[in-house]
Amino acid sequence: MKSVITTTISAADAAGRYPSTSDLQSVQGNIQRAAARLEAAEKLGSNHEAVVKEAGDACFSKYGYNKNPGEAGENQEKINKCYRDIDHYMRLINYTLVVGGTGPLDEWGIAGAREVYRTLNLPSAAYIAAFVFTRDRLCIPRDMSAQAGVEFCTALDYLINSLS
């Protein structure tokens, strides 16, 4: 799984060198942000049901046509699958926060996602709207500390940009 640490070591090893000072500074910065990432992961993990429900509700509110016949949310089973997918991505955001790198999202969430959505007639814009809602809904300090919020929003932005 890719993280700042594994990426740094892999790059140094591929070049047949020791990690440079800037490599080590990058790793040190990553480690210093670890407490904030873990706080964000803990808050997301303990509130994931509400986060997923609110994100899904926002998605269907903005894209109500998805409940029309022939669309991604035409029946309760398909609606439940949309909420399940949002939950899956939130879990990957959680893993990304714990790992400190985008590996979980890259390996398990983003690779091929656009192709799958297009093939299954699932609008990625609706999922993106759910993640944008989650990012924009975040309230500091009610939900988490400022630095934890930065880490959480950074992970969400990475996902949003990758699916766009």
UniProtKB/Swiss-Prot annotation:
The name this protein goes by in its record: R-phycoerythrin alpha chain
Localization per record: Plastid, Chloroplast thylakoid membrane
Residues the record lists as binding (2R,3E)-phycoerythrobilin 2: N47, R137, C139, R142
Subunit-level organization: Heterododecamer of 6 alpha and 6 beta chains. The basic functional unit of phycobiliproteins is a ring-shaped hexamer formed from two back-to-back trimers contacting via the alpha chain subunits. The trimers are composed of alpha/beta subunit heterodimers arranged around a three-fold axis of symmetry. The phycoerythrins also contain a gamma subunit which is located in the center of the hexamer.
GO cellular component: chloroplast thylakoid membrane; phycobilisome
CDD domains with a match to the protein in the record: PE_alpha
Protein keywords: Antenna complex, Bile pigment, Chloroplast, Chromophore, Electron transport, Membrane, Photosynthesis, Phycobilisome, Plastid, Thylakoid, Transport
PTM remark: Contains two covalently linked phycoerythrobilin chromophores. In PubMed:8876649 the authors refer to the bilins as phycoerythrobilins. In the PDB entries, the bilins are named as phycocyanobilins although the modeled compounds correspond to phycoerythrobilins.
GO biological process, one term: photosynthesis
UniProt signal peptide: none
More info: The light-harvesting antenna system in red algae and cyanobacteria is formed of phycobilisomes. These are composed of the phycobiliproteins phycoerythrin (CPE), phycocyanin (CPC) and allophycocyanin (APC). Cyanobacteria also contain phycoerythrocyanin (PCC). The phycobiliproteins all share the same subunit composition and organization with variations in the covalently bound open-chain tetrapyrrole chromophores.
Top-level lineage group: Eukaryota
Job description of the protein: Light-harvesting photosynthetic tetrapyrrole chromophore-protein from the phycobiliprotein complex.
Membrane topology reported for the UniProt record: Peripheral membrane protein
Primary location group: plastid
Source organism of the structure: Polysiphonia urceolata
Family that this chain belongs to: Belongs to the phycobiliprotein family.
Residue positions binding (2R,3E)-phycoerythrobilin 1: K81, C82, R84, H88
